[in-house]
Design a protein with these regions (language model features):
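Short, structured patches in soluble enzyme cores that scaffold and shape functional sites
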Residues: 43, 51-55, 59-61, 79-84, ...
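N-terminal low-complexity segments that are often proline-rich with Ser/Thr-Pro
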Residues: 1-29
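Catalytic-pocket segment enriched in acidic/His residues
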Residues: 87-205
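Generic beta-strand structural signal
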Residues: 28, 35-37, 47-55, 76-77
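Structural signature of FAD isoalloxazine-binding scaffolds in flavoprotein oxidoreductases
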Residues: 25-33, 51, 185, 189-195
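RNA pseudouridine synthases
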Residues: 66-81
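Short helix/loop capping segments that flank catalytic or ligand/cofactor-binding pockets
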Residues: 35, 66-68, 88-90
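A generic local secondary-structure boundary/capping motif
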Residues: 40-49, 54, 63-70, 96-100, ...
Length: 205
C-alpha cells in the first residue's frame, strides 16, 4: 500500500540518490557468504559499513530480449540477500561498484525457494535486524525495483545467463538513513529475513 511505497522513497531520499530512471549496477561477487559466516568489514579503510536486506532473484534460463509479461518463466527461485555496502567508499568514488563489491560483501541464503511457491512478483514480509534490533520492515513487492522490469530491461541486447542473481532494492531503515547515522562495527550481527524463505545472520569481523 501507500505506506510501504513511501518507505521506499524515504530510503532513497535519505541517501540522496535522485534519479529519473532506475540505476542498474553489476557487482563483482566471487562468492556469497552463507548463514553464520563472517563479513569482513575491511574496517581498516571502511568507516561507514552498512547493511541492505534484499530479495534475491535467481534465473533458471538464459534470458535475452525478455518481455515483462514473460519474466516469470525465467525465474528459478528466490532467496534472502544482504547487500553489504561501504558508504564512504561509494561516495569517495561517486559510484556503487567498489563500495558494494569488496570481498565478503554479499551474503545469501539459507535456501533458494523455487519460483512456483510464489506469485511473480512475490509479496513477502522482509526485515533486517542489527544485534536483535529491528531496522528494516517492509514487503517485497513494495521495493524500489520491479522484478519484471529489471529482468526485461537488463536482457535487452545482453544475455543474462542461467544462475544470474539479481537483487531488487532495500526498504527504509539502513544505517545511513538513521538520525544520527548508525553504521556497523566489529562484533555486530546482522540478520536478514524474508517470510516464506528464511533468515541469515552474519557477524562483522
Amino acid at each position: 500500500g501507500t505506506a510501504g511505497s513511501l518507505d521506499e522513497l524515504v530510503h532513497w531520499a535519505q541517501i540522496q540518490l535522485a534519479r529519473s530512471r532506475q540505476a542498474l549496477r553489476l557487482a563483482d561477487v566471487l562468492r556469497a557468504l552463507g548463514d553464520g559466516e563472517a563479513i569482513d568489514g575491511h574496517l581498516d579503510f571502511v568507516s561507514k559499513l552498512d547493511y541492505e536486506v534484499e530479495l534475491a532473484v535467481v534465473l533458471g534460463r538464459d534470458a535475452l530480449h525478455v518481455r515483462e509479461e514473460d519474466v516469470g518463466d525465467y525465474i528459478f527461485g528466490y532467496s534472502v540477500a544482504n547487500d553489504v555496502s561501504a558508504r564512504d567508499v561509494q561516495y569517495r568514488h561517486k559510484q556503487n561498484f567498489l563500495g558494494k563489491s569488496l570481498d565478503t560483501f554479499f551474503a545469501m541464503g539459507p535456501v533458494i525457494v523455487t519460483a512456483d511457491e510464489f506469485p511473480c512478483p512475490p509479496a513477502l514480509s522482509i526485515r533486517s535486524f542489527v544485534n536483535g534490533e529491528l531496522r528494516q520492515n517492509s514487503v517485497t513487492d513494495q521495493v524500489f525495483f520491479n522484478i519484471r522490469h529489471i529482468v526485461s530491461e537488463l536482457s535487452q541486447g545482453m544475455t543474462l545467463p542461467a544462475g544470474t542473481i539479481l537483487i531488487t532494492g532495500t526498504p527504509a531503515g539502513v544505517g545511513m538513513g538513521m538520525d544520527p547515522p548508525c553504521f556497523l562495527k566489529r562484533g555486530d550481527v546482522v540478520t536478514c529475513e524474508i517470510d516464506g524463505i528464511g533468515r541469515i545472520s552474519n557477524p562483522i569481523r
